[in-house]
Amino acid sequence: PIFEMYEEKAAFREFTKSISKGLLFLITFVRELLLGGDKIIDVFVSDAWLKDNDWMTWPALPWTAATVGAFLLGFQLGGIRLALLGGIGSLYVSIFGNWVPSIQTLSFVLITTPICFVLGLSFGIWGYLDRKVETALQPVLNVMQTMPQFAYLVPIIALFGLGDHAGSIATIVIATPPMIRNTILGLKRISPEVVEAGLMSGCTKTQLLFKVLIPTARRDILNGVNTVIMQCLAMVVIASFVGAKGLGLNLKIALNSLKIGKAAEAGFCIVLIAVILDRFTKAWANKQVDYFENLTFFQRYKLLIIFGTSILIFSIIAFIANGYFDKINYLYVIPIEKGFTFAHYIDAAVDWVWETFFYSLNSFNKFLLTEVLGPMKKAYLGMPVVATLTLTMGVAYIIGGIRTSLLVGGMMLFIAMSKYWDRALITMYMATFAVIMASLNGIIVGSIFAQTERGSKIILSVCDFFETFPSFVYLIPVIFLFNITDTSVLIAAIVYATVPATRYTVWGLNSVPLSLHEAGTMSGVSRIQRWTNIEIPLAFPTIMLGVNQTVVFTLQMVILGALIGTEDLGQLIFGALSRAQDGPGVAITLGLFVSLMAISVDVIVRKWAEERKKALGLA
């Protein structure tokens, strides 16, 4: 068995144990620091002394002090609006009884994000300095970013066991690639004049890197940090399958018990934390650094001093309040059973929707399954392997030539030669339907809002908001509307994947030169004619890149749909979690199949977009 194989290799076993213990120590230390406990005290005193003095514990950070801290940090980064977002968000999490699981989730993020940052920055710098390294990194990053998250869990369980450390390792593997890409992109964008100025100033290579290049690429690098944080929060539910504590585990337990109200509360907390961290990190990335300000010590650190003072004051008040509370000190933490809740209202709303619209929803579900999805599924499963390979290679040849055709054909042949071809076809059919619907939705919505500058800003802000949602959250509303069917998964995938299609449509239409708009108007074309004959053709290469992103988003959601029951590759990946002997190999292989599907589409679409841009004179 695979576990015995690892047991035989003492050095490898000790290596994985060391990593697990190190990560677990860091996560536990941060949680104890914020939530209180005796483990930090235990480091400095003996167990016997601690047993005799059980009153000696590390005090928890009062939620009141944390709320003030979030308000002050938001004010420092973005003014009163961001301050209110941080303060009200922290207040909501606290009084609704989700303070402890939220801190458990944040401790998870606080440990994984710096590790991802260091790894991503290091590999990004290496790739920037050495073109061969960058060339080698690109296919690896492509596979890592398109492989389903579940595929990583099985080998991580085999190597590192279960617990918070296993969830953090999975998150590090998934969240590091975007940091590498953003670092390389930011360093490449630096103009040669900046590099020459640094060299002319007498900088060594190290000084040039750390005092010129990295500060100049600061915005792109911090955008990478933002992406890393969003990936970490998107993983909190999936990490709960390998033992990670926090809001993700609460959400998973609530869904398993079909407690939609409790699941919605936990999901809303995850979304709220994601929105706050997203806005904070974006404000940090966009904040201009004043290198010439001449401020006193108090002026420079006044908010930090106020925060430190507030922690001291609220901690003293909370400590004194221990004498007034019998069992639970509500100034430290409000337990979930004592906090406010709107779960019963959500449950009542779900019951009302189900009772009122049962026949409509059921009829729509049956129609979609029997008249659309069923025939489409049969058509995919009935198509011969040779015909499928010929079709995909033919499309690739027409768009990109013999090299693209052979590359795409090789990837599809790798899938076809396995015994999972039928499951791959089911995945393809679900992804195809969702991509078509999401692309149409995105193009229509993006085209409507892109007509004015104000509309573009509004819809891009909406896209930013929805992109902060962890993917698992999209499954919550569709489960109670359509039960556990392919319809639920596909609707969640369509909503999730509409965001990139909308964003790229707006970007593409806004990139059309104003002079062409005016030329069309002067030629006497109507508004519809200008949109169909000028704007859409010129924006279509960019729109197709959005469709490319839609494919990746759709595949991720379709695989995630295995949690509520599907028959595709995702179900097999999910099932591999319980197979000790061959589970890791099966999960990685199936995850690679999904990755190859996404990469095949990416190769074809990007090649077409490049050729189309050249033909239109946009490249």
Residue ranges of model-derived segments:
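C-terminal transmembrane helix and the adjacent membrane-cytosol boundary/short C-terminal tail
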Residues: 188, 264-323, 545, 584-619
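Transmembrane-helix boundary motif in ABC transporter permease subunits
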Residues: 70-75, 89-103, 112-141, 392-402, ...
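Generic hydrophobic transmembrane alpha-helix motif, especially the helices
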Residues: 108-111, 115-122, 128, 138-175, ...
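Short cytoplasmic-facing helical segments at TM-TM junctions of multi-pass membrane proteins
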Residues: 179-225, 501-549, 573
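Transmembrane alpha-helices
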Residues: 113, 169, 173, 205-238, ...
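Glycine-rich helix-loop "coupling/hinge" segments at transmembrane-helix boundaries
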Residues: 158, 187, 230-273, 289, ...
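Interfacial loop/helix-cap signal at membrane boundaries in integral membrane proteins
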Residues: 1-64, 334-385
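Hydrophobic, membrane-inserted alpha-helices
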Residues: 65-72, 87-90, 151-155, 215, ...
